[in-house]
Amino acid sequence: IDNSTLEFDFRDKHYLAFRHKATFRLQRRYKDTSAQYFDTIPTIKDIINNKGFQRFVNDLPLAVPDSMAVRYSASVNSVHYFSVLPYGLNDLAVNKTLLEDVSVKNEMYFTIKVTFNQNGGGEDFEDVFMYWIHRETYKVDYIAYSYSEDDGKGIRFREGYNERYVEGVRFVDYNNYKPEDSAISLTDLPQLFEKGDLKLLSKIELENVTLKIN
């Protein structure tokens, strides 16, 4: 992953991630059918790189307010972040804590809690993640995270499925669940999942995945 070009489609958007040593470019491209630009449906391209965020409309740079740039950046970065997990968890801003092992569907899992330093942790440094890693395969099968919303805290639990390998790199899709009570602990989610007490919100499916070593 450190030196590669990754491309995939997610819902109605195309994503590209270029990484080479210390250089990176995370890109999202899509047609904005809700807007018109000189009587045409515009193609939007959002790019995050070492210099920051930039939006292009029909390949022409468009200045956006700082507040919107933060929102667009977070949206682009979130999809790219989840697409290659657990890659990135050894970054300097990441703090990992090993918790108690748990059983999920009669399989034993290591539990790893992940938090982020404010310095280098990005806009969402207060988010908390939990990873359940199979004790024998060392694969991440389940993920949970909490994040801040305007009206409080949001919680999600993801179940990996559709495992496949592209150029030796593992990719999975996710069933995306939500608990009824957002005040519960992330560590309670595997048991709620086993009981069927989580609500399935959506499926996170990456399509047309290609990976090229740079």
Task: Label every PLM stretch briefly.
Residues 49-122, 150-151, 213:
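Flexible, processing/modification-adjacent segments and terminal tails
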Residues 2-7, 23-32, 105-113, 140-142, ...:
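Short, hydrophobic/aromatic-rich segments at coil-to-beta transitions
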Residues 108-211:
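Gly/Pro-enriched, hydrophobic low-complexity segments
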Residues 9-11, 19, 27, 56, ...:
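A structural detector for beta-sheet-dominated domains
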Residues 9, 37-39, 94, 124-126, ...:
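Short solvent-exposed loop/turn micro-motifs enriched in small/polar/acidic residues
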Residues 1-59:
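N-terminal mature ectodomain segment of secretory-pathway/periplasmic proteins
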Residues 23, 32-34, 61-63, 148-149, ...:
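Short, surface-exposed beta-strand-loop junctions and turns on beta-sheet-rich folds
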Residues 14-21, 44-47, 95-103, 131, ...:
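Short, exposed beta-strand/loop patches in secreted or surface proteins that constitute
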